[in-house]
Amino acid sequence: MKGLGLPTEGEAISTKAKNDKYHRILEAAVTVFAQSGFHESTISQIARAAGVADGTIYLYFKNKDDILVHFFNYKTRQVFACFREEVDQAQTAVDKLRNLIRRHLDEFQKDRFMAVLYQAETHRINRLAEKQIHEMHKMYLDLIAEIVEQGQVEGAIRRDLYVGLVKRYIIGGVDEVINTWLHSDGKYDLTSMADPLVDLFIRGIGTQQELNG
């Protein structure tokens, strides 16, 4: 089998162990960054949280900045894939929007450390993961635009509104709801805010037909 270029059992186990350690370090870093703040965090803190030696960190990442970039490359794309899947399960634009917002709030509620880090870094002026944040933001806006355009075709969303304005109105509302929840130390159920929030959106952008329906 080795002649075919397939990994041996030992190589497969070694690769899995490396991947497991990579993800363990990444998850530990997210927790440390969220609790201590990115600039105040140290490699030693991350290593301790991950249960590895300080030097092990450098086998996977160049430095603390590199860990942050990997977080946005891996974790946020993983979450976005969940958003896409949730949207695709619905038929109408309003249901797609409801599924998207509900899943967004649910994912952030399930992983509060991720939510803290994501919100902090996306609002920072000098962002270390600028490229990754920009790409993630664009993917999310494009997904909302897709839903809005479908809603306009269906007659559920007003056609006199600019799609660019509507999608920023939606993402701004979601962002504010998450920030308010974080500032309250997560004292209430974030996911339960999804339906009321979407109802507010529809009252603002929905057609009379949709509101009467």
Regions found by a protein language model. Give the residues of each.
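Amphipathic alpha-helical packing segments from all-alpha helical-bundle domains
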Residues: R77-R84, L128-E154, G164-R168, G172, ...
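Alpha-helical DNA-contacting segments of helix-turn-helix folds
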Residues: L68-K75
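Amphipathic alpha-helical segments used for helix-helix packing
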Residues: Q109-L128, T180-H183
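C-terminal peripheral helix-coil segments that are non-catalytic and often amphipathic
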Residues: M1-E9, N99, R103-D106, D142, ...
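Short, hydrophobic secondary-structure boundary micro-motifs
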Residues: A115-Y118, R159-L161, L190, N212-G213
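Basic, helix-initiating cap at the start of DNA-binding domains
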Residues: M1-S36, S41-A49, D66
